[in-house]
């Protein structure tokens, strides 16, 4: 028997019972050797606890999509959504049935007007989150709109088997160390 559809917010806020039911939703088969949360943590390079929190935020986001108008996810929540879509039987079956409607994920059309629209929509999502759930979203999973969209054009998928990632700060420190180390060696051998 299918679970009941989650109710709409009452006086702008989700009911305690519906919030509990929302967070009780499980994704994927529970008897698998690798749970949804474990797969998410592995694929994203996250700690398992962070992945579990990201899934809870994704569930809240999905609820907002149904009850608070067009919403835009944080990068982390979007990664949960992408993985959930690969669990298609679960996604298009029990999950959307519980939400009470289908929830589609579409790409941007691109361009400056779309960037502006999605940034404003994301800010509205943060405001709706605070209103519906009675508290602001956690900043480590839902950064402010300006911060969330500042890094977006610079993000890339990277195959860590082929590439090593080093921060620019670390590279600058290594470069400075090599430069000053070279000066010290040159000075000690009388080259300067």
What are these regions (language model features)?
Residues 2-192:
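Acidic, Ser/Thr/Pro-rich intrinsically disordered cytosolic tails and loops
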């Amino acid at each position: 028997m299918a679970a009941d559809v989650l109710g709409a917010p009452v006086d702008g806020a989700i009911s305690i019972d519906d919030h509990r039911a929302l967070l009780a939703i499980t994704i994927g088969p529970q008897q698998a050797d690798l749970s949804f949360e474990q797969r998410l943590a592995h694929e994203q390079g996250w700690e398992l606890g962070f992945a579990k929190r990201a899934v809870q935020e994704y569930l809240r986001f999905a609820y907002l999509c149904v009850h608070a108008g067009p919403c835009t996810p944080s990068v982390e929540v979007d990664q949960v959504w992408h993985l959930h879509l690969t669990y298609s039987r679960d996604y298009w079956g029990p999950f959307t049935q519980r939400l009470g409607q289908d929830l589609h994920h579409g790409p941007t059309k691109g361009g400056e007007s779309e960037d502006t629209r999605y940034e404003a929509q994301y800010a509205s999502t943060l405001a709706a989150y605070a209103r519906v759930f009675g508290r602001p979203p956690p900043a480590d999973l839902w950064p402010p709109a300006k911060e969330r969209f500042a890094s977006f054009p610079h993000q890339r998928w990277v195959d860590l088997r082929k590439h090593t990632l080093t921060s620019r700060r670390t590279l600058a420190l290594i470069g400075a160390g090599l430069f000053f180390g070279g000066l010290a060696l040159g000075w000690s051998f009388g080259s300067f």
